[in-house]
């Protein structure tokens, strides 16, 4: 084998390893550090392949976490987006995140799902704020007192991880008004 072939083959292998390392989302971490109304410590990658750990990496003082469990629930998530985008404009200390929550799975499956979502979501803000969690869903649901996966769950969380408000299901004016009242009360 010529030296040139060895160099080219080595470059291809190293390039492939780097590419896989760059796009493969790691398994999420889950730690329940406090009982009561606190968001557990979780890690995941957004659709721009950046790793986050929450609550440490919450960007603002008040963070709305929207948790869907099934792909079809994206339609329910979408009912909230216009309202939470308006709330974000009205209250600079507020931001929202989507955290699709999926069972732990092999690396190729995680890559396939994340890259599929990435391809289907061209909006840069949505990519930045969609952090997929691959973890033990039973422990996650137990920590957040989520009884089932039949609907989406929303949590208003401060930087310390304290849950200030929670709701279930599609947007309604009543739920949004309640959220705004809580935001006003803690500001």
Describe the role of every protein-language-model region:
Residues 73-123:
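Structural microenvironment flanking redox-active thiols in thiol-disulfide oxidoreductases
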Residues 60-62, 92-95, 151, 159-160:
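Loop/turn elements at helix/coil->beta-strand transitions in domains of secreted/extracellular proteins
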Residues 71-73, 102-106, 137-139, 162-163, ...:
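Solvent-exposed loop/turn segments at secondary-structure junctions
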Residues 1-38:
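N-terminal targeting signals for export/organelle localization
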Residues 27-54, 79:
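N-terminal "domain-start" segment that seeds a small globular fold
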Residues 141-143, 149-187:
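Thiol-/selenol-based redox modules, centered on thioredoxin-like
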Residues 54-79, 96:
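Short active-site neighborhood of thiol/selenol oxidoreductases, capturing the structured segment around
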């Amino acid at each position: 084998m010529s030296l040139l072939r060895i160099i080219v083959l080595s470059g291809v292998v190293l390039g492939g390893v780097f590419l896989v390392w760059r796009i493969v989302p790691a398994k999420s971490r889950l730690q329940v550090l406090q009982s009561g109304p606190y968001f557990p410590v979780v890690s995941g990658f957004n659709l721009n392949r950046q790793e986050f750990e929450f609550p440490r990496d919450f960007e603002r003082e008040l963070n709305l976490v929207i948790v869907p469990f099934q792909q079809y629930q994206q339609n329910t998530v979408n009912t909230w987006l216009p309202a939470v985008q308006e709330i974000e404009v009205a209250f600079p200390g507020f931001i929202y995140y989507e955290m699709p929550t999926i069972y732990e799975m092999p690396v190729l499956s995680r890559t396939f799902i994340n890259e599929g979502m990435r391809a289907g979501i061209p909006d840069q803000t949505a990519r930045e704020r969609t952090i997929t969690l691959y973890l033990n869903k039973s422990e996650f649901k137990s920590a957040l007192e989520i009884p089932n996966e039949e609907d989406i769950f929303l949590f208003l969380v401060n930087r310390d991880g304290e849950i200030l408000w929670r709701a279930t299901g599609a947007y309604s004016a009543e739920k949004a008004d309640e959220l705004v009242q809580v935001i006003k009360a803690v500001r």
